[in-house]
Amino acid sequence: MKIGVVSLGCAKNLVDSEILLGKLKGAGVELTPNPEEADVIIVNTCGFIEPAKLESIETILEFAESGKEVIVMGCLVERYKEELEKEIPEVKAYFGTESWNEILNYLGLKEKKEIKRILSTPRSYAYLKIAEGCNRLCSFCAIPKIRGRHRSRKIEEIVDEAKFLADQGVKEICVVSQDTTYYGKDLYKEYKLVELLEGLEKVEGIKWIRLLYLYPTEVHEDLIDYVANSEKVLPYFDVPLQHVSDRVLKDMRRGYDGKFVRNLIENIRKKIENAVFRTTFIVGFPTESEEDFKELKKFVEEGHFHWLGVFTYSPEEGTHAYPLGDPIPREVKEERREELMAIQRGITRKKNEEFLGKEIEVLIDGYEEEFSFVPKGRAYFQAPEVDGVVYVESSRDLKSGDILKVKVTQVADYDLAGRDTEALDLIFSSEE
């Protein structure tokens, strides 16, 4: 029996899929990355927002119509299990999140040996999930209903997993959870992210540590100071702000206002000159007026962010904002999104141009799919999958996980290109 696992949605979902792959492998199952070769297909779904739900349903239907045995798990099932069972009865079984053992039992399998995870990312990086769930009550978000309350993992357990990842050849760990800065508050009764980072920084083989999903109000001084002085934690701040209008932020129940946002960015920049910011905004929230959007647009134009994602609001059942309806037309929401992304495209290019002629450190992820001879990687200011990349011209046979110095020679809107200066040094030194 061959089994294929298809993972949809965010990096946190991907970690769940990798854990499942490890358990299946530990049970002696033959795995395949190609669903067409599989006898059983397990789809790990996302149910966060409308486009993600549609993608999940389309994927389920596609595989269900293929005649293969299909099992569905994840966020979509947590929200809509009864409806799914009724509407797509072709699926053999439905399971919620973290249902790895239940799936093994259903398939009549038992783990013969423990395999923590099977990585589906390049060996250069991996995601490290430090907690599950969320205690926030943002009015637009259904995650607490899907994933439950915040549950931190123990520090020693996380550090052990980081050692496992290092043993696999991983050089960069991307720390993820629904609310990374809340880490430890539930388990240890106080914030413990800095203490966790101290433990992770001691793991041999790990060169970069990247923090993702930082909640604005919990980016405390001790965390900023730690990042400022750390050898491994990158000065990369992924802080989802969602808006900057005081009125909209209040209606979103975010717990801060526009002044707080500006002060936070200013404080980080004051302490970390080369800090890079990524954020996300939501446009088309039910109470967002034209003036609110103009305020957000002006804020984006100020150029605080190297990377920016914009989502159009979609009403989610069971959230505090759901009774507000969806009064802003889809076309208006799309126009607002496109307007912000167009502004940000120019800002990102300008920020990339600041690296022209400079030497940067690049972690190689692999090779460009269309041009298999072109290595590509990322610098400290580029998170995997969501930001741009650096294409590298080199005379060496570069591998995933290599870290090298690259002199930037070209930039585009999102990507950069440069020469492997270490290879040039090797050539010239051999001629002396």
UniProtKB/Swiss-Prot annotation:
Q: Which domain of life is it from?
A: Bacteria
TRAM domain mapped to chain residues: 353-422
Q: How is the cofactor bound?
A: Binds 2 [4Fe-4S] clusters. One cluster is coordinated with 3 cysteines and an exchangeable S-adenosyl-L-methionine.
* EC number(s) given by UniProt: 2.8.4.4
Gene3D superfamilies registered for this protein in UniProt: Methylthiotransferase, N-terminal domain (3.40.50.12160), Nucleic acid-binding proteins (2.40.50.140), tm_1862 like domain (3.80.30.20)
Sites binding [4Fe-4S] cluster 2 sit at C134, C138, C141
Q: Where does [4Fe-4S] cluster 1 bind?
A: C10, C46, C75
**What GO molecular function annotations does the UniProt record carry, in alphabetical order?**
4 iron, 4 sulfur cluster binding; aspartic acid methylthiotransferase activity; metal ion binding; protein methylthiotransferase activity
Q: Kindly indicate whether the keyword Lyase belongs to this entry.
A: no
GO CC term, one of those recorded: cytosol
Q: Which residues form the MTTase N-terminal domain?
A: 1-112
**Cofactor(s), by name:** [4Fe-4S] cluster
Cross-referenced PROSITE patterns, in alphabetical order?
A: MTTASE_N, MTTASE_RADICAL, RADICAL_SAM, TRAM
Catalytic activity, per the record? Answer: L-aspartate(89)-[ribosomal protein uS12]-hydrogen + (sulfur carrier)-SH + AH2 + 2 S-adenosyl-L-methionine = 3-methylsulfanyl-L-aspartate(89)-[ribosomal protein uS12]-hydrogen + (sulfur carrier)-H + 5'-deoxyadenosine + L-methionine + A + S-adenosyl-L-homocysteine + 2 H(+)
| Entries under CDD domains matching the protein | Radical_SAM (cd01335)
Among InterPro entries, the record links this protein to: Elp3/MiaA/NifB-like_rSAM, Methylthiotransferase, Methylthiotransferase_CS, Methylthiotransferase_N, Methylthiotransferase_N_sf, NA-bd_OB-fold, Ribosomal_uS12_MeSTrfase_RimO, rSAM
Name of the top EC class for this enzyme: transferase
Q: Where is the Radical SAM core domain?
A: 120-350
GO annotation terms (biological process): tRNA modification
Where is this protein found? Cytoplasm
Pfam family example for this protein? UPF0004
Give the family, as the similarity comment puts it: Belongs to the methylthiotransferase family. RimO subfamily.
Role summary? Catalyzes the methylthiolation of an aspartic acid residue of ribosomal protein uS12.
Protein name according to UniProt: Ribosomal protein uS12 methylthiotransferase RimO
Gene behind this chain?
rimO
